[in-house]
Each structure stands twice: as C-alpha cells, then as structure tokens.
Amino acid sequence: MKQHLVIFDTTLRDGEQSPGASMTKEEKIRVARQLEKMRVDVIEAGFAAASPGDFDAIHSIAQTIKDSTVCSLARANENDIRRAGEAIKPAQSGRIHTFIATSPIHMEKKLRMTPDQVVEQAVKAIGWAREYTDDIEFSAEDAGRSDLDFLCRIFEEVIKAGATTINVPDTVGYNIPSQYAETMRQLIERVPNSDKVVWSVHCHNDLGLAVSNSLAAVLCGARQVECTINGLGERAGNAALEEIVMAVRTRADVFPVETRIDTTQIVPASKLVSQITGYPVQPNKAVVGANAFAHESGIHQDGVLKHRETYEIMRAQDVGWTQNKLVLGKHSGRNAFKNRLQELGIELESDEALNAAFARFKELADKKHEIFDEDLHALVSDDLVTPDQEYYKLVYSRVCSETGEMPRASVILNIGGVEHKAEADGGGPVDATFKAIESIAGSGAELLLYSVNAITTGTDAQGEVTTRLSKGDRIVNGNGADTDIVIASARSYLNALNKLHSTLDKVKAQGGV
C-alpha cells in the first residue's frame, strides 16, 4: 500500500513574497477556499507576526477552512509563536511552523549566535508552540548549506522537545537532486526517532531544480512537500505544486506515495492565483501553461488524433482544462449567473456582493455577446475590492486620439467622496490616462510593469491589464479588466494605487524558509 504524501501549500506565505504579489484578506480567503477544494493537506496562510494584516488574514482563514490544516509561520521566538498560536486558534486543525537558521553563514552573520545557542533557542520554540497545538513543524533555514552533523544534532533535540514535522529547506536553491536526496537519506538514517516524525522538503528554484530536488527527496523518504501554485515565490520561485502532484500521479510506477489532491482543480487554482497576483503563467509552463496540451507538429497531431497516449502522458481534463464555452448571455438571469459561479467554485459573501457582481455582468453582457468562464473570474476579482480599499475610484474617463495628434485623456476620480478632474497629453491613450490620474493622485509611484492579455478570443474580448508600481520599498500589482483596454488600464493602475494606500499593506518581517 502506498504511503501518503502531504502537500503543504505556501502560496499565501512564501508565494506572496514575490515582488508585488501581496494579497488582500479577501483575496487570501478566496485562494484558501480553492486550495481546500483541491484537497491540499496543509495551507500555510501567512506569517502572523509580520503585521496586523497578516494576523487578521490567518485568523479569518482559520475560521473559514474546515478540511485542511491551517498553518502560520513563526520565527523561533516567544512573541512570534504567541501570535501564530492566537492566529490559528479558530482552526479545526492548526499548525505552527517555526524556524531558525542553521547554516554557518546565517548563524554568524544574521543571527550572531553560536550553534549551541541556536539549538537551545529551537528547543525553547517547540516548547512555546506546544502551548497552542500538538502539530508543530520545525525548519532549519538554509539547511541546504548547513553542516550535516549539526542538522542531525538540532533535529534530534527538537524531536525530543515535541516537533512532529521536520522540514529541510533548500532556502537559496543551492542543491542538486543527488546531493539533496543523499542529505535526506542520511538524516532519516542518522537522527534518533526519525520514524516518529514526517520529513518535509521546501525547495527554491534559483537553479531551476526545485521540483527535481523535491521529488528526489521523496524517493529517499520525505513525506511532505512544500510548494506553491504556479511555482510562485520570491526570487526564482518555489517548487510548483501542480508539477509535484502530477509527477507523483503520472509516475506511480516510480513513486511509493500518493496524494489526496483533486487534480481537476489544478488549472482553476492556477488561473485564480495568476489573476489575483498579476503574475501570468508562461505558455510552455508544465501542466498549467496554455500550450501544455497543444500539438503543433503534424506528426504529433496525427498521433494524438489516432491515440492520445502517443504524445500525451496526462489527460488535459484530469488537471482541469476545459474548452472555452458560452455559458451566459445578456438575457441570462440572476439565478443562472449565481449557479454558474457556484459551478466555478466562486462563492460570494453576501447577497449585496452577488447583486454587485450581477450588475457588472449585465454591463459586460451589453458590451460583448459571449460571456465565458474566464470573463466571470475577472469580473468577480474586480468586485472583491471593498469600499474601504477603494480610496481612488474611477468615475469617468475619455480619450481623444487622432492620426498625427498627441492623445489627450480626461479623467474624473472620486477621492474620499470628492470628485477631482484632470486632463493630460501622452505618447498614447494609456500613457495620457495614467498621466491624468497621476496629476490628481500625485502618488510619486514608479511604473515597473504594464502588460495586457486577452482573457478570451475574439475582438470583443476583455483585456486584462496588470500594472506593477513601486514606491519606496513597496511594490504592488494592480489588475483591471474591460472590453475597453484604456478603461481596463485605468482600473488596473487605480487598483495598484489603492493597494499602496491601503492600511492592509504590510512590511514583511525578515526571514523565511
């Protein structure tokens, strides 16, 4: 009988540390619900001590999620662990994930602690965590560059103290598969009582080896993999959940483990995270890329038509790919709209939220005749912005553009109940619109990224715009969608400005695995 492989998703914590990928509480809850629907075992909902906003989001997710363990990260100090324990208190199943660095360079340069002090602090951390839960994970930050003998020593002590999961992170993505697998094998072999805990891996993708390293460790005894949707994460990202899960499932002949993941929810989760964070999925991305099941070669096409398994090792529908289909139109009623949202796994909090979304749907249906599932996802994402998060609100936008003349934009913004109007010229209609908005907002933010993607096919398709703004040490992504690209751009820019302004934005606590 195959052993269970725990899937630990850290999209909401490590994934959110990607530049500009910070999410609101409502967005985090929406992602957490999708992860629960996908049957993820553990959801790392955030870093409770990082900010009041992070604490609140974890606490809300702990109240909402019933079928997955809700986890908070915490440094190995009493305050962090207390905040984590309070945040996960409402959870039906809660975990505290505490960590301390163990590599020589981290202990000396960052912690300024001796190895003995690090071991002592780690043991204390487990004791503090046990006051809140029996499910305690310990991570040795930068284990990939740590001395093996020291890892054996610290893991032995934290297991004695009550840790139930031992995580061996390759924090900077330094290891190669054979090396990482051997580390895992030796740890399990040498650490006393290693059979009493779950051994976990957390790999970063700096050398493009996060998934390979994780799978190599699974073959050597790891029974938890920490990963993120789309491989989202700081620097080059983390191990991609979809690749780990499908590798284990597709190569069941090789891996002695199985997961409980509902793989048909993988693509919906990928699209949701991409939409919320503003990080597009590259077309050739394994499993969830737009081209993952596309065949251009005539020889390949002929083979697939004759027998799918000639060139496909997975079925597209098994990971949640479906053909775009017309689902609703301008004559569709509120109940049909509500039912389709439920089929897509989209839950709105109240009748007021449903009414607002339905009103936006009717506006969209007047602009384009065919409404696809992707349109509904984009529409609901726009409606997740609550009034207290919408300091800047677009009231009116107009652009005059003609051949040989510089475009001129006119915008009206509502700021705190007061309308402000401005006009500006620009190198194009979008440039003019952004300049008009800035002449009112005066944010001083720097535009780092502007990108447009068609949500569906056709000339009447909605354009989904992502903007990335930087101000000081803060980077945020904004999203907006509309059949009018200029309006979508304005919404995206204002969405980013509102995130910069929002009191929910936070300064991340330093550290992480």
UniProtKB/Swiss-Prot annotation:
Organism field: Dechloromonas aromatica (strain RCB)
Chain positions covered by the region annotation Regulatory domain: 393-513
InterPro entries found in the cross-reference section: 2-IPM_HCS-like (IPR050073), 2-isopropylmalate_synth_dimer (IPR013709), AIPM/Hcit_synth_CS (IPR002034), Aldolase_TIM (IPR013785), LeuA/HCS_post-cat (IPR054691), LeuA_allosteric_dom_sf (IPR036230), LeuA_bact_synth (IPR005671), PYR_CT (IPR000891)
The protein's name: 2-isopropylmalate synthase
Binding site for Mn(2+): 14, 202, 204, 238
SMART domains (UniProt xref): LeuA_dimer
Lineage: Bacteria, Pseudomonadati, Pseudomonadota, Betaproteobacteria, Rhodocyclales
NCBIfam families: leuA_bact, PRK00915.1-3, PRK00915.1-4
Entry GO CC: cytosol
HAMAP family, alphabetized: LeuA_type1 (MF_01025)
Molecular-function GO terms, alphabetical: 2-isopropylmalate synthase activity; acetyl-CoA C-acetyltransferase activity; manganese ion binding
Family: Belongs to the alpha-IPM synthase/homocitrate synthase family. LeuA type 1 subfamily.
Reaction(s) this enzyme catalyzes, per UniProt: 3-methyl-2-oxobutanoate + acetyl-CoA + H2O = (2S)-2-isopropylmalate + CoA + H(+)
Cofactor(s) listed: Mn(2+)
Domain Pyruvate carboxyltransferase: 5-267
EC number: 2.3.3.13
